[in-house]
């Protein structure tokens, strides 16, 4: 959680964007952003993240105000930790960090549900 490595943070951000989509679309969701964008986001973030963030803004509008605030805070915290633009390409070791960040963030989501 305290890791500031850019690929790790991008993985965490991807997980949050996925959760926003899942909550906004609910049972209407056939294909998730993970199905469609995971590999591209992990290899060429600069070409994918602007699109994903625009989609998230549309999805946020469908949520209750409380969930909008919750996710906006998460997005602001994660994006605020990015120290540069989205990278053009991630190396294989960086892709590994992306995957770890994604699954750490996803696990945190499931852990919170279990505790509730």
Model-derived features with residue positions:
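Intrinsic-disorder/low-complexity detector
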Residues: 1-116
């Amino acid at each position: 959680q305290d890791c500031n490595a850019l690929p790790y943070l991008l993985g965490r951000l991807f997980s949050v964007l996925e959760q926003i989509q899942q909550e906004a679309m609910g049972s209407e969701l056939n294909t998730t952003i993970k199905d469609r964008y995971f590999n591209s986001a992990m290899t060429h973030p600069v070409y994918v993240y602007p699109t994903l963030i625009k989609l998230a803004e549309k999805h946020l509008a469908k949520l209750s105000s409380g969930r909008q605030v919750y996710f906006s805070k998460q997005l602001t915290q994660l994006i605020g930790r990015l120290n540069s633009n989205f990278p053009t390409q991630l190396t294989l070791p960086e892709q590994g960090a992306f995957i770890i960040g994604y699954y750490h963030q996803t696990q945190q989501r499931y852990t919170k549900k279990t505790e509730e």
